[in-house]
Amino acid sequence: MIQKNTLLEVADNSGARAVLCIGLLGGRKSASIGDTVIVSTKSITPRGKVEKGKVYRAVVVRVKSPIRKSDGSVIRFSSNAVVLINDQGEPLGTRVFGPVKKLSSGSFMKIMSLAVEVL
């Protein structure tokens, strides 16, 4: 589960490497896959689309905590990862790295189509 002050990896090519969760949308205490969080960039790559210290929205695509599927199997990722999005819900990057759990919300279909592997 993702909560405030959680350090997250960025799973796209927007230019950010690591971000810090500074808020959760919807008044929750923790976020899971498919939830939108408010993040601040902590480390960036040169010539990226984002700036260090700026605030962005992001969608959680991977969490370390185990997730039980309806068939009884369990999925566990090795890292907590997000994809940065703009105010309209579209991803800032053009590629998504690593596996992505199927996002239940229909508003993030673009992220699932950019992903290499959808579980």
UniProtKB/Swiss-Prot annotation:
It comes from the Bacteria. GO terms for biological process: translation. InterPro entries: Ribosomal_uL14, Ribosomal_uL14_bac-type, Ribosomal_uL14_CS, Ribosomal_uL14_sf. Disulfide bonds: none annotated. Keywords: Ribonucleoprotein, Ribosomal protein, RNA-binding, rRNA-binding. GO terms for cellular component: cytosolic large ribosomal subunit. One of its GO terms (molecular function) is large ribosomal subunit rRNA binding. Coiled coil: none annotated. The keyword Cytoplasm does not apply. HAMAP family: Ribosomal_uL14. Belongs to the universal ribosomal protein uL14 family. Part of the 50S ribosomal subunit. Forms a cluster with proteins L3 and L19. In the 70S ribosome, L14 and L19 interact and together make contacts with the 16S rRNA in bridges B5 and B8. Binds to 23S rRNA. Forms part of two intersubunit bridges in the 70S ribosome. PANTHER family: 50S/60S RIBOSOMAL PROTEIN L14/L23, LARGE RIBOSOMAL SUBUNIT PROTEIN UL14M. This is Large ribosomal subunit protein uL14. It comes from Wolbachia sp. subsp. Drosophila simulans (strain wRi). The gene is rplN.
